[in-house]
Each structure stands twice: as structure tokens, then as C-alpha cells.
């Protein structure tokens, strides 16, 4: 196993433990009410479809109806899988003028409970190279679309997906990276391959990704000159932006989403 895969295995092991800890606090599967909480404005100006982008893996593609060339985002799901929560976030982002491909690292499976989610995430931990290939294929799929500016593609994910967003950045050239409370790499030498800005969203009460680790990550980015914007929301814990979780914090979630849109607009639309 190469050092990159070993690092990814270690990162996923820590993240799976963090997700499991969060699930033990009573985090249920998303419901229709939970999905409604994620809706951010009018999405009537978009179209969506399921697309095959890697082997038999189907992703959820959301894009503006109007003709044009748009920046794009590879969106990566939490440990539950490509569920309705993530699809709603893809719709919301597409409505802001992005082509969004929400990937499926589980090949069609979605965890119905924390045990199933842990097993699905554990399979990725056992074969991390395939997950990297999956996400890299998503980038290439977007580059091949006629309506995508192939110089303006970002990655974005939450929790498990936040960690994978960073891992994609370590393995593929992008234009921006967004990490919501994902496990972090704090070795500046390893991070130095990243040549574009990073947005990080975290909670001060997140015991799985403590503030000390976030600060080390920020310091490592600064050490090698990687532009970054790190926000630590006081008084909220892990997965605070997930309305199906016990830590859901709607005000902080709204603010984080606004900061995410500002960041992506600045890095991808200018």
C-alpha cells in the first residue's frame, strides 16, 4: 500500500469513528421534513438527471436550464451515501449557477442506520484507491461537458465527504475546495501539492475534529502559502449543518452556506 493510500486509510478510520460517535447521539436517516430544511431558494431554473460517470456508478447531476458555460462542483456525500439531503444541496447549488455532480462512492447503496453507514464507509476504508478513482472520474466527466468551464471545478463535501473533498484535492488539480467538518491533513509537505484556495467550516464543540486540529490545519496551509478561509462556529458540534442530526444549528448552517456561496462565487466565477 502506497503512503497516500495509507494516509487515506488512517483518515477514513478516524472519520468513520467520528461519524459513528455522532450517530450514537441519535442521528436518524433524513426525512422529508429534514430535506425541506435544506432548501435554499427557487430551484425551478435547473434540470437534474442521473448520470453514469465511473464504471456502473450513477451520480446526480444538477445544472441550470439556461444555455451557457458554468463553473462546476464535485459534491461528496456524508457517510450515509447519496441520499435526498445531498441531492437537495446539489439542486440548491445548481440554482446559484453551477453544474453540480453529486458523486456516489457506494455504488447505489444508502445506509438506513448507523450500522449500515459504518459498513459502507468501512468498505471505502478497505479500498481507498477506488474512491479516489471515482472522484477523479467525476472531475473528468464534468470537464467533458460542453457547458462546463473545465478550469473552474471545485470539490465540496460534509463529514465523510469533507474528508474526501480534501483527499480529492490531494490527488487532482482543482480550482477550489470546500470542507465541512471533515478529517484533516496537518502535514504541510503533503498539503503543498494544493495550489488553490480552501474553505473550511467547523464547529467549536466538535470532539471528533477538535479546534486544535483545525488550527494545525490552518497553520499548515499558511506555512506553504495556500490561501484559506477557516470558520469555526462557536457552540456547535459535528455535523451541525445536517438537519437530521441532533447537533443541527439552523442559524449557523445558513451563515455557513452564505459563506460557501461567497467563496465559490469568488473563486469560480471571477
Spans of features found by a protein language model:
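Acidic catalytic loop of the alpha/beta-hydrolase fold
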Residues: 205-209
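Short alpha-helix in the alpha/beta-hydrolase fold that links the catalytic acid
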Residues: 89, 210-220
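Short beta-strand/loop motif that positions the catalytic acidic residue
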Residues: 200-202
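C-terminal motif of bacterial Sec signal peptides marking the signal peptidase cleavage site
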Residues: 16-18
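Primarily recognizes the serine-hydrolase "nucleophile elbow" in alpha/beta-hydrolase
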Residues: 136-194
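Serine-hydrolase catalytic machinery in alpha/beta-hydrolase-like enzymes
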Residues: 24-144, 244
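C-terminal catalytic histidine-bearing segment of alpha/beta-hydrolase fold enzymes
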Residues: 222-270
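Bacterial signal peptide processing site
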Residues: 20-22
Amino acid at each position: 500500500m502506497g503512503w497516500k493510500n495509507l494516509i487515506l486509510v488512517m483518515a477514513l478510520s478516524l472519520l468513520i469513528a467520528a461519524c459513528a460517535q455522532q450517530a450514537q447521539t441519535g442521528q436518524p436517516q433524513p426525512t422529508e421534513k429534514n430535506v425541506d430544511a435544506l432548501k435554499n431558494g427557487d430551484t425551478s431554473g435547473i434540470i437534474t438527471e442521473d448520470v453514469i460517470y465511473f464504471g456502473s456508478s450513477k451520480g446526480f447531476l444538477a445544472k441550470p436550464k439556461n444555455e451557457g458555460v458554468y463553473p462546476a462542483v464535485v459534491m461528496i456525500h456524508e457517510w450515509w451515501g447519496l441520499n435526498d439531503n445531498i441531492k437537495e444541496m446539489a439542486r440548491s447549488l445548481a440554482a446559484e449557477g453551477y453544474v453540480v455532480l453529486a458523486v456516489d462512492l457506494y455504488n447505489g447503496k444508502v445506509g438506513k442506520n448507523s450500522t449500515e453507514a459504518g459498513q459502507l464507509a468501512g468498505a471505502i476504508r478497505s479500498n481507498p484507491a477506488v474512491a479516489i478513482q471515482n472522484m477523479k472520474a467525476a472531475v473528468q466527466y464534468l470537464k467533458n461537458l460542453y457547458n462546463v468551464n473545465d478550469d473552474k471545478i471545485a470539490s465540496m463535501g460534509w463529514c465523510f465527504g469533507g474528508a474526501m473533498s480534501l483527499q480529492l484535492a490531494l490527488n487532482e488539480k482543482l480550482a477550489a475546495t470546500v470542507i465541512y467538518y471533515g478529517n484533516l491533513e496537518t502535514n504541510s509537505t503533503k498539503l503543498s501539492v494544493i495550489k488553490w484556495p480552501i474553505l473550511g467550516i467547523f464547529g467549536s464543540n466538535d470532539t471528533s475534529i477538535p479546534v486544535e486540529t483545525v488550527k494545525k490545519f490552518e497553520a499548515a496551509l499558511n506555512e506553504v502559502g495556500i490561501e484559506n478561509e477557516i470558520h469555526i462556529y462557536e457552540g456547535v458540534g459535528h455535523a451541525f449543518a445536517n438537519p437530521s442530526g441532533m447537533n443541527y444549528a439552523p442559524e449557523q448552517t445558513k451563515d455557513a452556506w452564505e459563506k460557501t456561496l461567497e467563496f465559490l462565487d469568488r473563486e469560480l466565477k471571477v
